[in-house]
């Protein structure tokens, strides 16, 4: 389509993000067809700027965990994440345009923001994205988008550089279990970008089971 090669704000996905991470609390499956990973109107969906609110619409109406889970998705899934000022602390959440969504943030809130759980979790996942090209530019292959759980690969290869990230997301209020068979997981050494723990996947019958904490994320790296 005309102008399909231009990087733009990802409005179709934005509406889904608000439903999944806002008070509607829809399941991860709501995001699947808005990703356009295989076919769609965009020449390159990986260059779209992903977001859940901005100055021209109501801010995301979510509790702290909603923001944390939204950021865990934005900084691990396809696209270029964009965070509107103040959302790193849940500022004026739910407020509409001209009803508070553009209010002055101020130095006092900036100083206090470092103690916000939204900010601390955002800082962590943003740093992990910054350090790993698979999360920035890797192809996304979905394994599971259902209810409170999501699992997908980000696969990057350029020249002699290669990295695979297995992303596990849990937006539920209880720990969630994940298991993968030999057809889903490559044998060899994997390392958690979250904890630093290493895992050796057996080459004879590779399988893996793990648990992701409530409102948590796991990123396993294979290089």
What function would you assign to each model-found segment?
Residues 47-49, 80-83, 164-166:
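Beta-sheet entry/capping signal
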Residues 148-150, 163, 214-219:
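Short hydrophobic/aromatic beta-strand or adjacent loop that forms the aromatic wall/cage
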